[in-house]
Amino acid sequence: MKRRAVVLFSGGLDSTACLYWAKKQYDEVIMLTVNYGSNEERVTNKVAEYFSKELDVRLKIVKLDFLKEFSEIRGSSLVGGEVPRVTAEELEDIEKASETARSVWIPARNLVLISVAASLLDALGGGDIIVGFNAEEATTFPDNSREFVEKLNEALRFATLNPVKVVAPLIDLDKRGIAKLLKELNAKYEYSNSCYNPKGFTEDGRPIHCGECESCVRRHKGLIEGIGEDKTVYAITPRI
């Protein structure tokens, strides 16, 4: 029986690692990128198109206007306003990290995205939803936790006609571990985008990261500490 997977692809290190991992594990892989009006949407779509061609994987981009509207109601800085700037030291402060997480929170995003992926897989006959949830982000984003995955899979038993489950291959890893996995998989991570406020692309197609948002700092710190290098292009090199 053919093993099928849908990779929820947001363009960053986590989903890029998941994509390369899934390509080795499954017979059929589909990338699913969801647009909801975020600041980095244009860059995310181009990154998704790049990896779709690079790995010869089918890409589906879904637009969810209602999620943009709900995010605007909530006042999420990911769809408007200024994204918080943080330092590596501030990321170690749970209160400060939680404050930043609240600023960029998209209402029930992961639940909504997984529902979309589950619907697609149910229509195709079932399969696995591959998500980039990891131990580091689970400390500030509860919808990245192992418990969340377990509860989702309990619900999916009742929600789909065909068997669908969530698989989180990075669930025990921090950014350093993810960096090491990317290197093992020979992933072209420099073409991925983690930035909440990207500045466009280089001539060879690499996203230009702001270097100041939480996601940029986590990315740079993880790569340097994990594999001793960072090929990412930054407008301002993050201070770690």
Swiss-Prot record:
Binds 1 zinc ion per subunit. Its cofactor is Zn(2+). It catalyses: 7-carboxy-7-deazaguanine + NH4(+) + ATP = 7-cyano-7-deazaguanine + ADP + phosphate + H2O + H(+). Gene3D superfamilies: HUPs. CDD domains: QueC-like (cd01995). InterPro entries: QueC, Rossmann-like_a/b/a_fold. Catalyzes the ATP-dependent conversion of 7-carboxy-7-deazaguanine (CDG) to 7-cyano-7-deazaguanine (preQ(0)). This is 7-cyano-7-deazaguanine synthase.
